[in-house]
């Protein structure tokens, strides 16, 4: 593998640790990656139907412990699985249970030493937890998602872009049963600092159909590579939305490559 190709593979691992799910770069044939993540989001305000901040009746807490796993069926086809266990409470509910379980496949539509484009299709089965951030626990039955991802790395930098930097954009359509359908747009930028450190800046946005909930969250994390292991620590904040909590909290990820 070329130096640029190896850099892209490392970027792929980091992107896949995000709540966006599938990334532009697939796993090589026979390679496996397992990611564990923990999030604890709290909010005492939310965004009303007009998108204006408003106090909640009581603090809302959502705690999630999740797993994401992927396996390279071929160099261009990757099988993926993700699921989580949730607990939370607000003024109206106090719950604990399984979140949605999702299985999908990513196909590498095109790739060279700097750029990758992929298409993803997946199926999710709802659980007792929140199957959407704006939904009541247990609401929603099953989902189908299609997602297109495009990423580009800059090994030597380019203009104001520092060396060993990458950008990725993902656009998705999620067809839901028991909840409104959604469109999603996620953007990631990352840059390497030395051999073992990386800084990531990410934005996760989406909107439910029929004038429903809308959200935009930003996240900044620092990643440390430890051989075949990596540790990611950071903070996520909801900065805009409609009918969604203004949540914030820590994000911790641990993954292992085989």
Annotated model-derived regions:
Residues 52-55, 88-93, 132-137, 172-175, ...:
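Extracellular loop and loop/strand-boundary signature of outer-membrane beta-barrel proteins
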Residues 36-40, 81-85, 119-125, 163-173, ...:
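Transmembrane beta-barrel strands of outer-membrane/channel proteins
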Residues 102-105, 222-227, 234, 246-258:
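Outer-membrane beta-barrel "beta-signal"
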Residues 31, 62-64, 98-104, 143-145, ...:
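Transmembrane beta-barrel architecture of outer-membrane proteins
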Residues 26-27, 38-40, 71, 107-109, ...:
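Residue-level signature of outer-membrane beta-barrel architecture
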Residues 18-51, 55-57, 148, 158-163:
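Outer-membrane beta-barrel biogenesis signature
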Residues 85-183, 187, 225:
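Outer-membrane pore/translocation modules
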Residues 41, 74-78, 86, 110-114, ...:
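Outer-membrane beta-barrel channels and translocator barrels
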């Amino acid at each position: 593998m070329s130096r640029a190709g190896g850099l892209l593979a490392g970027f792929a691992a980091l992107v896949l640790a995000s709540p966006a799910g599938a990334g532009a770069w697939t796993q090589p044939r026979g390679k496996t990656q397992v990611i564990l993540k923990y999030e604890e989001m709290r909010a005492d305000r939310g965004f009303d139907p007009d998108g204006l901040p408003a106090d909640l009746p009581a603090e809302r807490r959502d705690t999630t412990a999740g797993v994401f796993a992927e396996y390279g069926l071929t160099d261009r086809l990757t099988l993926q699985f993700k699921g989580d266990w949730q607990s939370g409470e607000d003024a109206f509910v106090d719950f604990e249970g399984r979140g949605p379980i999702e299985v999908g496949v990513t196909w590498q539509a095109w790739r060279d030493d700097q750029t990758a484009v992929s298409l993803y299709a997946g199926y999710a089965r709802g659980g007792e937890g929140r199957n959407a951030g704006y939904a009541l626990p247990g609401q929603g039955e099953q989902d189908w998602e299609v997602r297109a991802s495009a990423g580009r790395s800059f090994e030597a930098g380019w203009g104001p872009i520092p060396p060993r930097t990458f950008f990725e954009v993902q656009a998705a359509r999620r067809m839901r049963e028991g909840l409104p359908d959604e469109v999603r747009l996620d953007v990631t930028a990352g840059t390497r600092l030395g051999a073992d450190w990386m800084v990531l800046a990410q934005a996760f946005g989406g909107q439910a159909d029929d004038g429903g909930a809308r959200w935009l969250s930003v996240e900044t994390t620092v990643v440390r590579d430890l051989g075949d292991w990596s540790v990611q620590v950071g903070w996520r904040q909801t900065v805009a939305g409609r009918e969604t909590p203004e949540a914030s909290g820590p994000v911790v990820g641990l993954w292992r490559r085989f």
